[in-house]
Amino acid sequence: MSSLSDQLAQVASNNATVALDRKRRQKLHSASLIYNSKTAATQDYDFIFENASKALEELSQIEPKFAIFSRTLFSESSISLDRNVQTKEEIKDLDNAINAYLLLASSKWYLAPTLHATEWLVRRFQIHVKNTEMLLLSTLNYYQTPVFKRILSIIKLPPLFNCLSNFVRSEKPPTALTMIKLFNDMDFLKLYTSYLDQCIKHNATYTNQLLFTTCCFINVVAFNSNNDEKLNQLVPILLEISAKLLASKSKDCQIAAHTILVVFATALPLKKTIILAAMETILSNLDAKEAKHSALLTICKLFQTLKGQGNVDQLPSKIFKLFDSKFDTVSILTFLDKEDKPVCDKFITSYTRSIARYDRSKLNIILSLLKKIRLERYEVRLIITDLIYLSEILEDKSQLVELFEYFISINEDLVLKCLKSLGLTGELFEIRLTTSLFTNADVNTDIVKQLSDPVETTKKDTASFQTFLDKHSELINTTNVSMLTETGERYKKVLSLFTEAIGKGYKASSFLTSFFTTLESRITFLLRVTISPAAPTALKLISLNNIAKYINSIEKEVNIFTLVPCLICALRDASIKVRTGVKKILSLIAKRPSTKHYFLSDKLYGENVTIPMLNPKDSEAWLSGFLNEYVTENYDISRILTPKRNEKVFLMFWANQALLIPSPYAKTVLLDNLNKSPTYASSYSSLFEEFISHYLENRSSWEKSCIANKTNFEHFERSLVNLVSPKEKQSFMIDFVLSALNSDYEQLANIAAERLISIFASLNNAQKLKIVQNIVDSSSNVESSYDTVGVLQSLPLDSDIFVSILNQNSISNEMDQTDFSKRRRRRSSTSKNAFLKEEVSQLAELHLRKLTIILEALDKVRNVGSEKLLFTLLSLLSDLETLDQDGGLPVLYAQETLISCTLNTITYLKEHGCTELTNVRADILVSAIRNSASPQVQNKLLLVIGSLATLSSEVILHSVMPIFTFMGAHSIRQDDEFTTKVVERTILTVVPALIKNSKGNEKEEMEFLLLSFTTALQHVPRHRRVKLFSTLIKTLDPVKALGSFLFLIAQQYSSALVNFKIGEARILIEFIKALLVDLHVNEELSGLNDLLDIIKLLTSSKSSSEKKKSLESRVLFSNGVLNFSESEFLTFMNNTFEFINKITEETDQDYYDVRRNLRLKVYSVLLDETSDKKLIRNIREEFGTLLEGVLFFINSVELTFSCITSQENEEASDSETSLSDHTTEIKEILFKVLGNVLQILPVDEFVNAVLPLLSTSTNEDIRYHLTLVIGSKFELEGSEAIPIVNNVMKVLLDRMPLESKSVVISQVILNTMTALVSKYGKKLEGSILTQALTLATEKVSSDMTEVKISSLALITNCVQVLGVKSIAFYPKIVPPSIKLFDASLADSSNPLKEQLQVAILLLFAGLIKRIPSFLMSNILDVLHVIYFSREVDSSIRLSVISLIIENIDLKEVLKVLFRIWSTEIATSNDTVAVSLFLSTLESTVENIDKKSATSQSPIFFKLLLSLFEFRSISSFDNNTISRIEASVHEISNSYVLKMNDKVFRPLFVILVRWAFDGEGVTNAGITETERLLAFFKFFNKLQENLRGIITSYFTYLLEPVDMLLKRFISKDMENVNLRRLVINSLTSSLKFDRDEYWKSTSRFELISVSLVNQLSNIENSIGKYLVKAIGALASNNSGVDEHNQILNKLIVEHMKASCSSNEKLWAIRAMKLIYSKIGESWLVLLPQLVPVIAELLEDDDEEIEREVRTGLVKVVENVLGEPFDRYLD
């Protein structure tokens, strides 16, 4: 029986759609999939039904199955159908119909009609309430769509779907993680699988649903991958659903099941029984082609998960047959051929073993399977074992031969171990399979003996052999024909029978005598067995034993040397026992007499085939010698096969034997031995002419013969091809090689190619050319059997061959020309028209292909070359251009390859001593460069020209113009590494050749090159400029080229500035600085001097027409610079000097980059002890020249440019102004340049160079700038420069009187000395410092402010250094400085006022730091300066104040602060001064110690009262004063904290008397209200900080505050702010009372009356503060009943009807606050309050009534815990 809760839930569910009231019905009706609730609520069923019917009709057109619902769910009668009044059976039928509809509609939710049709079911049948599970299940796979979100918004989620609850009202759809959580619930999983089962039964599955289901199942498995318990729970569910999916006819269902099974088995390895059952289920219903691949993949992966023993056993018979019926051999092999096939060795092993057990007809596919899969060792072992067992029962064992050959090829040891484990040996197994298998040649002699001579022969055995003989009687041979000539197939059958007979235990002699009736046939058969690779080793040994027997039966007169060649071939056998047996037979033959009657001499190798034999004596001698030298351990017998004596005879003999012997194996052996003979020559190869010539025709028969005899056909052909010997003279042999290359046989072609490569170098040139041409011709055939290009590139070709082959494949024949005139090739339209013909076009393409292949080969060889080859290549370049321009063929690759070959050839010629070339076609190169559209080709051609430059300077002279014009226009604009390297290399090679051949015009050529390159500078990629131009400058010689280059760049810099391209100008400066990095400092200085010389030339041309004409012909000035107007020229000169300034100045970046810093580069040379003295002298000379040049321009700037303007007579008068401006600017820039130049030298050199100029120079500007530079020169110098600094200081001190008339020089001298004193300080001589201080104190009184400022700065630094030693100058420093400050305050027009005040402040700061005790007397003056230096930034003044606080006695500071406030600050109306004063005071208070604070407390409180009175005398606005007072309160609170009660209490009393009585008031203008306001603000702040510590201090205030409160009541005192402050002070005191101070009856009675009576006229704005105060008083006294009664009575007095509304309102609020805080203490007083409350509830003022009802009454009820109405009743 279900629980009560379950029963209630069921009742609720049944009644979910029953609506008993209107709201409930409206809510049910408004639930909609389409409309919002408001719209849905207004719709009737007829409207909804009409829309749904139309939608259903549309769905029926898509899926006819929907039509059935038009008679049920969508019938007219359904409009009036109410499911709440239906019977159970009717409801069940309705639910079934709805479920069927939802199943069918599940795949159509992406269609709008589905939504509209389902809307009817929601609105009429409430499926979102009654059929929730089916609705959710059928739409769950749409969980990320808006449709599902809409369903969630109207549905009531069943318990199993609670995971979706977070998304019911969310804008976001459910996530994939939500689905995992949902499916991870076992109950839900069972529900969903049940639903899926219904879908499968009704064929309602679809791809999207299956994809969703599969993904969810997979995610659940992955989610629980580490939870074996949960995975085991999933086993029955997933297997069940997989089985149902597999039972479906749908291929999608089956593929889904496959996926689920694979993933699940991977996560949790299943038992083999389950996997076999799954495999059977997978196969049972498998028909669709697409599903078959998935099924096979699944089966393989399932088997791969198996672990432990028996995982690769044979499949059960039933499953194997089922699998066999579904998958044919081709499909399995196709599956295994795919690159993405899975690891499937376990299944393939099981399947292979199953074939061996159940279906032997398919043994032939096992090998194909094994070759396509990699098996584990144990798997291979099991298959081998199965096949060995199978060999025992299989009649036709030939099926197993290939399998075991494969196994032996991959692991012979494993096969032998398997045989051994089954009690077999390799020899016996070979006999069983009737073929040779193993390479291991060591056989067991006992086995051979056992096989050769069975122990005893019974009648039964005889009968059995007779039966065997009768069965194979067709193979009996009764003729004396040699078995060596027998066909391969017949021999193979006889060999198999022989092996089988031996294996069955029959005697070998019985078999031989029965199947071969003649001695000849027996012996030749046994010989063939001996040399047959197909024969087992044991059988060969048996054969050798029988040969020995049969030889003895041959007559003595017969010479059996004819058998020797075959036996010699048998010596190649791997088995030493076989070779030993052969040697024994050879010994028997050697013992026989040598007669002329040779055994089978005309039949052994075929009927009527006469074998040329040796002379009997020679044969006897040869055999004897061979046996003496032969050792059985030796495989290689080539050395002893042809003895030196009669070598030619023996070579001829063996050559004939190799030609005539029919066995391919024997032929291979003999040919190998012949080819190894060092004396074998091509003369012997003539024997093979007929055989070789017809070999290709007979190749297929030889191939079959090799296969039948198990002879390696590749080895056979290699031996044959190796007959082509080095220095081959026979043309038929060369033809054979070429025929082999051109044949369709890939193996033969490759062997021929290898042989050709090895002997090519030994052939004559005609043969080489023939071969190369053949290969080139073959290369045009895309179906060649060998790698034509690879072979051609592997041949050792020389330059003559290349020249010949290139000429043979050339379309122009200009090599015979001797007159290489420098002309351009001309083309006619006829050549273009010719190329339009298809035949000609095809020939051209073929020609291009051949040419490309030849060039590739040449490019790979590299180490060949000759002048003839070079000219040929250049000629071909012209051919390619023709093919490109006229034929339109793709010659780009061929051109690049040809150029590469040309470069290699030139390099080769240089390396091999070639120094000069003549008649080089330069026009071809230039034409190719200009006409090519490929930057790569152009670049490589430039490299060719560069390489030719040293070999043919004539080419350069005739081509330099087009070459460099082209480079400037194209190459240097390319942004790639290769092009850059090309241009650099061209420069490095071409420029020297150009200069070498310039013949006196070197400068002109150099300037032409520089102009060409700099013109294209803007087009060169920025990151490649430095490398390119650095290469150019270095190649041209920086000493000669740098000045001209800088001038050209200066022009571009000026142009950029004129056109406002500031970015470009900056880039040019960076470029030049980076360029100068790679140059030596001497070269850099020389370049700058050359630049100044060029500028001098240019300026002189403006004053002399003759000089101008002489410069017009110079390339450097050919760009219009000589034709500038006056203004343009002045601008250019200004910008040029600015350019020089920029490249010589030292920036922050240069400071950190040693390579860019000119000064450091000079230092590194001058200070390096290893530097060459000549170099140092050159640098000094160059520097002197540079300094001289700059000074020349400075001294002559006005004269120079006035001469220029005098030539311009037509200029307007404003040009004079322009000239003046330009001259001033140029002069300023020149002085900057001078400073840069002077900084270049080390300090000692610099000082020696500059100091004399200060005395000798008459130009004031020069002296000014020189002095200015001195100051900056020492910035980076260390203490080692002290002697130099002393010297400089002395000179400057001496110069000062002389420069007194010049303000700027005086100022700069003082500033320089200031900088030096600041840097070197105490290290300077004391006398110099004293002189400097004396000078400075004198100059303080100067009339010029600039000098005053500089003097003050020098004094400051000197005082810093001298300290107390400067005390003698104190009267000359401090008083004058104060006077200066006061004078500056009065002087409002001085533009340097700020700087002067800063200088004074800094001076005082220095004095404070160094001599603070001496400054005490003037500390007031110092503060005066600080507070009133209005021009100085506040941060500076605050810093000086900090110094005062740190260094001056704070007691004295506090006294001075009181004085200065009273005398100056208070009356100044300067907010900044007041602010700085307060900052000083604050810092003083913070830093003063408690003892000092206590001793100075009277002064501080005097100052405090003065600050309180500031309000009455200040003209500041109220907000400003309030901020000042707030700061004062903070400071005073900090001060109070440093005092004890004993000291502070009397001072507090003084404050109280000052506030209430006016005692001690210094300013009569301050009112009582202002005093009280100041006091209470201070007191309230004090209470916040000290809290209960000063509660008792209220004693001094009690009566005055009581009187003040009464004055507020009587309105004698009216100030809302003051009233608020007083009330707040009481509140704070009450709040912080910890000592029951306010519980004293006397204090309580005194203050309670006056405080409560404030209710009578309290202002609304501060009423809340009064309420808080009364509440605090009540709370403080809550434990004293008498006080509670008094307070209650006092408050009630103000709640009576006679009181004003405002009074009653605040009284009510006070009472409410009291009851909310301490209501329980006041409950006893409630009876007194009830009548008052009752009266107030009937008050005419609604606000009062509301406040009582909603406020006071509610609070009282909370305290009482019961309604207040009872008390009222």
Curated annotation (Swiss-Prot):
UniProt name for this protein: U3 small nucleolar RNA-associated protein 10
Annotated S-S bridges: none
What residue ranges are annotated as transmembrane? none
Recorded superkingdom: Eukaryota
The GO molecular function terms of this record are: snoRNA binding; U3 snoRNA binding
Note in the entry: Present with 18200 molecules/cell in log phase SD medium.
Q: Does the keyword Nucleus apply?
A: yes
Q: How does it assemble?
A: Interacts with snoRNA U3. Interacts with MPP10. Component of the ribosomal small subunit (SSU) processome composed of at least 40 protein subunits and snoRNA U3. In the absence of snoRNA3, forms a complex with other t-UTPs. This complex can associate with pre-18S ribosomal RNAs.
